[in-house]
């Protein structure tokens, strides 16, 4: 039986120790539900096995600070300002971006082949900020140690976890080293929503063209293409679309386009 602990509001030392070790894999609460967190190739392999998931989607990199995001992902000033706005307002946001060449080389230099599981065929990943305190604490601390944290929702592929730890399923629970519980925290983020109406995931915005290249700066121009594309709706979609409109004259909405 996998050990369960309650998140106490501060950094989970047990979770940190597991992720710092080799092949560690935990379940952690976020603003929208539970995720599987890991920090190396062995852990990523366990994540895919636990979820029985295909491997064509971009991996999710959890950024514990804006400095980490800037160190890893290619950004332009408009995209960086867009992220900063969501950071300052504590809004969950994930964008599909290419890696900085030097950061990708560092990823490959780990020598375990994790880059194959972290990127899609175009070499992009989804870089996520403000995903929830428990995970942010772990990601920030591990980044201080030079380690990145990778994630996937902790539910059988194609099914939601309903924001409750019992929704992660036996297969995932049995495949990880630790489950950090915080059902109350998850519920507190969407207090006016029911199980049926709550968002199960965060918003995802593609900031790359069809070949995975970073979209150009718009600089106030109109009818720019390629432009940002909202490819997944989710928590705070209304605020994020407002920020898109404030930052970019052109952006698109294509629910599910990537997947």
What do these predicted ranges mean?
Residues 1-259:
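Active-site-adjacent structural elements in enzyme catalytic cores
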